């Protein structure tokens, strides 16, 4: 099992499928508004497209097109884990995820924050030290109106 949440990973789906034909990819989907606001708030200094709203929307559009292509081409390759569903029902969602990965589930899957051996150097470093929380759901709704003029041309932004 390998975990990497680099924002550019979707570019390598073809290579991953070719090198590791049995690989499983977990595509964590989040409300696009929440993802875009998170990118803007976290100042991703080394990510060139993350500093301009139009570039962020274009990048997301490319991401959705590429993910959808691979999901249609290889139905058992990519699992969509809806972030908000996972926050609301972590046990059932983690069971489905583990089943997709052909792994057995146990309660420790929900107790990841108790582990001392997990290392993270990302904006999520605090999140892995705490239980799953729901306070980020809908907190970005007040910004939706500001982003509508950019997102209206994309069917994934609603």
What positions do the PLM features span?
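PAPS-dependent sulfotransferases, especially Golgi type II membrane carbohydrate sulfotransferases
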Residues: 1, 36-80, 87-158
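Glycine-rich phosphate-binding loop used to anchor ATP phosphates in small-molecule kinases
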Residues: 1-17
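Generic beta-strand/beta-sheet core signal
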Residues: 4-6, 26-29, 81
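Short, flexible loop/turn elements at secondary-structure junctions
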Residues: 7-8, 32, 85-87
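Short, well-structured alpha-helical interface segments that form or flank functional binding sites
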Residues: 11, 31, 92
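Conserved phosphate-donor/acceptor-positioning beta-strand/loop module used by diverse small-molecule
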Residues: 16-41
């Amino acid at each position: 099992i390998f975990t990497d949440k680099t924002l550019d990973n979707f570019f390598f789906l073809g290579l991953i499928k070719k090198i590791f034909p049995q690989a499983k990819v977990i595509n964590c989907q989040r409300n696009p508004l929440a993802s875009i606001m998170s990118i803007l708030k976290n100042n991703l200094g080394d990510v060139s497209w993350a500093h301009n709203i139009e570039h962020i929307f274009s990048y997301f559009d490319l991401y959705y097109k590429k993910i959808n292509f691979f999901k249609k081409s290889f139905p058992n390759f990519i699992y969509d884990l809806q972030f908000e569903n996972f926050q609301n029902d972590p046990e059932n969602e983690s069971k489905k995820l583990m089943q997709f990965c052909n792994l057995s589930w146990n309660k420790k899957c929900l107790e990841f924050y108790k582990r001392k051996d997990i290392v993270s150097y990302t904006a999520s470093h605090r999140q892995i030290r705490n239980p799953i929380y729901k306070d980020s759901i809908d907190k970005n709704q007040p910004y939706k109106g500001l982003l509508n003029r950019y997102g209206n041309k994309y069917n994934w932004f609603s």
